[in-house]
Design a protein with these regions (language model features):
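Internal catalytic domains of large membrane-associated glycosyltransferases
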Residues: 44-182
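N-terminal membrane-anchoring/stem segments of glycan-assembly enzymes
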Residues: 1-58
């Protein structure tokens, strides 16, 4: 009988420890959920504040270089380049670099699209390397060395940004001039 009483007490003790552990787990989980929601709210408020930062007049906006790296991506090339040309930014401050390391006929298409947009008054160049060291990252780095401007937007060729992309993304830089990227 004493063994049964001891066993019953031991089981009761194990049960109570498990209940306490479960309560601690649930309490921790609730704390993390509440903390997550508070931080999310703070982040959303901060984002709203940053996006409400007014842009200066067009004449005072900085130059922005849009880089579009590509490698054998002919089917999406024209769409990506033309989307960059549709960005709502002063044309004299928008510089587009098509960084095409293609080994197929995409390079010809890139030069054709670039020539068409240059005729329309865009500052756009097609840069092609024979040495593909670093792949797309190498192309981006090499092209950055060829421009005096500080602001860059990098889009993969299959990405189609909304026309207001630059106006939206540049706002935080005016609220925080010491920021390096958004």
């Amino acid at each position: 009988m004493a063994i049964l009483n001891t066993l019953a007490l031991l089981l009761l003790l194990v049960f109570l420890v498990c209940c306490l552990a479960l309560a601690a787990f649930i309490g921790s989980l609730l704390y993390m959920v509440v903390l997550h929601h508070r931080l999310k709210e703070q982040g959303l408020r901060r984002e709203e504040e940053l996006l409400a930062t007014p842009l200066p007049p067009d004449a005072e906006l900085p130059h922005v270089v849009v880089q579009i790296p590509s490698f054998n991506e002919g089917p999406v090339l024209r769409r990506g380049i033309e989307a960059a040309a549709r960005l709502d930014w002063p044309r004299d401050k928008l510089h587009i670099q098509v960084l095409d390391d293609s080994t197929d006929d995409t390079a010809v298409l890139a030069r054709t699209v670039v020539a068409e947009l240059r005729e329309q008054g865009f500052d756009i160049v097609a840069l092609q390397r024979t040495d593909r060291s670093g792949y797309k990252g190498g192309a981006l780095h090499e092209a950055m060395q060829k421009t005096p401007y500080d602001y860059f937007a990098i889009f993969d060729v299959d990405y189609v940004p909304e026309p207001d992309f630059l106006r939206t993304c540049m706002r935080p830089f005016f609220a925080n001039p010491d920021w390096a990227f958004v």
